[in-house]
């Protein structure tokens, strides 16, 4: 069986961090490996199907209920994982069910840190790159709170 692109796949930082919806078949994992992805971060409460089919792709589980934001410690752990993997030349991909809400929240925090953006600017940028990202006010607030805690700029304006 060959590789096939997973749903809603795109690079947020080429060769470093990608996003996608839930991978559902072995070809999706082979596609990720072919793209240089070595770490798959799953934000869903259940593990993705067939995740054991490609042992070279390490699965990292961060259980976040649908339509809720990741906890601050989950965001920090995710960003550390991305930083450490990238330092070794390894790409990371992150997914939730559709690759929008929980995934978008993590990606906006990544962009805020990587590009020095405020929370609202990071949210706008991830929505430009991946339309539909960040689905709830609580997810928006998680990004803004992360940025305030990280000193990435004062940010309390409405989006």
Task: For every predicted segment, state its role.
Residues 1-92, 106-159:
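Cys-dependent protein tyrosine phosphatase-like superfamily
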Residues 96:
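Short cysteine clusters
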Residues 99:
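Conserved G/P- and acidic residue-centered "switch" motifs that form tight phosphate/ATP-binding loops
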Residues 103:
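Ser/Thr-glycine-rich phosphate-binding loops at phosphate-binding pockets of nucleotides
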């Amino acid at each position: 069986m060959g590789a096939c692109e997973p749903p809603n796949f795109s690079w947020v930082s080429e060769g470093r961090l990608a996003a996608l919806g839930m991978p559902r078949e072995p070809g999706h994992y082979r596609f990720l490996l072919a793209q240089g992805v070595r770490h798959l971060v799953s934000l869903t409460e259940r593990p993705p199907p067939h995740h054991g089919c490609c042992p070279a792709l390490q699965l990292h589980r961060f259980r976040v209920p649908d339509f809720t934001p990741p906890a601050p410690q989950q965001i920090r752990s995710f960003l550390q994982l991305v930083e450490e993997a990238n330092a070794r030349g390894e790409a990371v991909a992150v997914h939730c069910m559709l690759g929008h809400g929980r995934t978008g929240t993590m990606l906006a925090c990544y962009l805020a840190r990587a590009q020095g953006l405020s929370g609202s600017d990071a949210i706008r940028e991830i929505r430009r790159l991946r339309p539909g990202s960040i689905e709830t006010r609580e997810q928006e607030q998680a990004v803004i709170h992360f940025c305030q805690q990280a000193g990435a700029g004062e940010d309390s304006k409405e989006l």
